[in-house]
Amino acid sequence: MSSKLVNSLRLTFLSFLGIVSTSLDAMPAGNPAFPVIPGINVEQKSACAFDLCNSYDVLSALSGNLKLCFCGDYIFSEEAQVKDVPVVTSVTTSGVGPSPTITSTTKNRNFDLVDCSLSANCVAAAFSLPDRTMSAIPLFDASFEVKIGGLKQYYRLPMNAYRDFTSDPLNSESEVTDGLIEVQSNYGFVWDVSLKKVLWKDGVSFVGVGVDYRHASCPIDYIIANSQANPEVFIADSDGKLSLKEWSVCLGLTTYVNDYILPYVAFSVGNVSREAPDNSFKKLEERFTNLKFKVRKITSSHRGNICIGATNYIADNFFYNVEGRWGSQRAVNISGGFQF
């Protein structure tokens, strides 16, 4: 393939990523060449360098290579919704006497997260199987990674997203109150699995794809309800668990810059869902005389992010990676580790 055609394909791919990502949120993509970066080039005795096409590591030559890493993922804001919530828009009272007729008018609404943040810290092990052929479309060049660690969440949501207007009829329109629910968790257990594969390479550039799944269960630290009638109702609850399930698929491109730095750009799409525990909101109900709650899933579907990052080797077989992502999600991912 001519160099002019290759450069045109790279430019087209980068332009496509830039266009489609502006309207769309997902997990970190990582470097598309992650499965084939072996670490140290032993021909350079005094410096670390990328050796993307050949490896002199015995373990890598025989069976692959192993990476042990630390990973931190920090989400500063995220867009998500509680969808199709039946909400009372008006209450009409007719008739006289001790039992008047009360009619409520309802309408389905979507509620957006007002604020959301997430912090995850994990240790990871990744096994990679490089392809030793010079084929542009490799058979192997794949890696499998497992992460375990701790994850903490916080979000604020309009109170009516968790209201239950069906269990007890409202007596007046004044009970159709609005406000905010704040939920903060402690660190809970999180696990994450991912699979990455190089689809195409020419020794300088790589196109890769990745699939990632994350699952977390975090103990509730506190829940705060703010409304017009009740300025602040606070409960602390460590029994309930706030769950998070997330998956994403990414496609990325990386191009060789020098012997130490490998920058990349990727596009990632996926889905996330959060669900608070029923028992925690039952405790919150006990603090109110006229409010009932129903827990609903918070979802962010068909999400997309543009991911830009770089991988750097700063010592023998030691690397670190920094990635930022923008879209419906604003986040930073930092990872580093040793390769064997």
Swiss-Prot record:
GO annotation terms (biological process):
monoatomic ion transport
- Cell compartment(s), UniProt: Cell outer membrane
One GO cellular component term: cell outer membrane
Q: Which UniProt keywords apply?
A: Cell outer membrane, Ion transport, Membrane, Porin, Signal, Transmembrane, Transmembrane beta strand, Transport
Question: Could you list the residue ranges that cross the membrane?
Answer: none
Q: Which GO terms describe its molecular function?
A: porin activity; structural molecule activity
- InterPro entries per the UniProt record, alphabetical: Major_OMP_Chlamydia, OMP/PagP_b-brl
Spell out the protein name for this chain.
Answer: Outer membrane protein B
Q: Gene symbol?
A: ompB
